[in-house]
A protein has these predicted regions:
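Acidic, glycine-rich loop-and-beta core segments that form the ion-binding/anion-interacting portion
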Residues: 29, 34-95
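Helix-terminus/linker motif at the lipid-water interface of multi-pass membrane proteins
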Residues: 1-5, 66-93, 97, 115, ...
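Short amphipathic alpha-helix initiation/capping segments at coil-to-helix junctions
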Residues: 102, 163, 172, 179-187, ...
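Hydrophobic alpha-helical transmembrane bundles that constitute the permease/transmembrane domains
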Residues: 15-23, 55, 59-71, 78, ...
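C-terminal structured "cap/appendage" subdomains that terminate the fold
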Residues: 190-213, 220-226
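Short alpha-helical transmembrane segments in multi-pass integral membrane proteins
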Residues: 2-56, 113-180, 222-261
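Alpha-helical transmembrane segments and their helix-entry boundary regions
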Residues: 10-11, 85, 200-204, 231-232
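Small-residue-rich hydrophobic transmembrane alpha-helices
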Residues: 87-145, 149-151, 184-203
């Protein structure tokens, strides 16, 4: 806004962000402390498929934000009009920060879990998962505390004109939508965990459920049942379905392994 480029400036800033991120990462990559590099090797189709399986969950996670935004915008537009969509913009922008925190936690734990799993250290793997979930729970508690005590303050960042209707929509939306993060953070960590311990099927199912399938179905059904509030609580419903599904698949996989042994 200070430059006066308007929406063009917002688009330009969005394009510059990944370039800045890559530039920062390049500093480490080119330093003497880095021991990871690219080497020419004959490609293996089987190895490529294996790597892709482990990466599908992350791909779906990146894709889901766009899908959710499109579905939510259309549903909210039909129920609450442009002001409802504006309220969702407030909720969505703040949720990006929360998702980024949990994704950072999961991405930080994933290589440590993967290393311990590769070394055949199941005790260390369980310990890392336990600590990851504990930190996740602490962050979730902090987020809920901030949302419920500073709702109007957070909304005012995006509501410079003090629109009362926008405030009312966003106030309810922010509190209901962020209830979903009580479970969302745990799911993000679990998906990263199962990718790290070479269980791509559970990770893929979890990603597709929470990122596309469950969230879309829950949003459509709950919107018809409860209107705008139904859309706000669809995240909690979808994440709960995903969590229960992951637990079921993990339990089923564990029983199968015990039967083989």
């Amino acid at each position: 806004f200070p430059v006066g480029l308007g929406f063009s400036g917002a688009g330009l800033a969005t394009a510059i962000c990944p370039i800045v991120t890559m530039s920062v990462c390049t500093i480490h990559y080119r330093s003497s402390r880095n021991h990871v590099g690219f080497y020419w090797k004959k490609p293996s189709f089987r190895h490529l498929i294996s790597c892709c399986q482990l990466g599908v969950s992350a791909f779906v996670g990146e894709l889901s934000s766009g899908v959710i935004a499109i579905v939510f915008n259309f549903l909210i537009l039909g129920i609450a009009g442009n002001m409802g969509v504006a309220a969702y913009g407030v909720v969505a922008n703040l949720s990006i920060v929360a998702f980024a925190i949990f994704n950072g936690l999961a991405q930080g734990a994933q290589p440590l879990i993967s290393e311990s799993y590769g070394k055949g250290q199941p005790t260390q793997v369980r310990k890392l998962l336990k600590w990851s979930l504990l930190v996740c729970f602490a962050v979730e508690t902090l987020i809920q505390l901030i949302i419920w005590t500073s709702t109007d303050t957070l909304i005012s960042i995006f509501n410079s004109e003090n629109n009362v209707q926008l405030l009312n929509y966003a106030h309810t939306g922010l509190r209901l939508y962020f209830l979903g993060f009580i479970v969302a953070g745990i799911n993000i960590v679990l998906v990263a965990y199962f990718s790290a311990v070479d269980e791509p099927k559970i990770a893929i199912v979890g990603s597709f459920l929470r990122g596309i399938i469950a969230i879309v179905i829950c949003a459509v059904i709950l919107a018809k049942l409860f209107g705008l509030n139904g859309i706000w609580i669809s995240l909690l419903a979808a994440e709960t379905v995903t969590f229960l599904t992951i637990l079921f698949l993990a339990y089923k996989d564990r029983r199968k392994r015990m039967a083989v042994v």
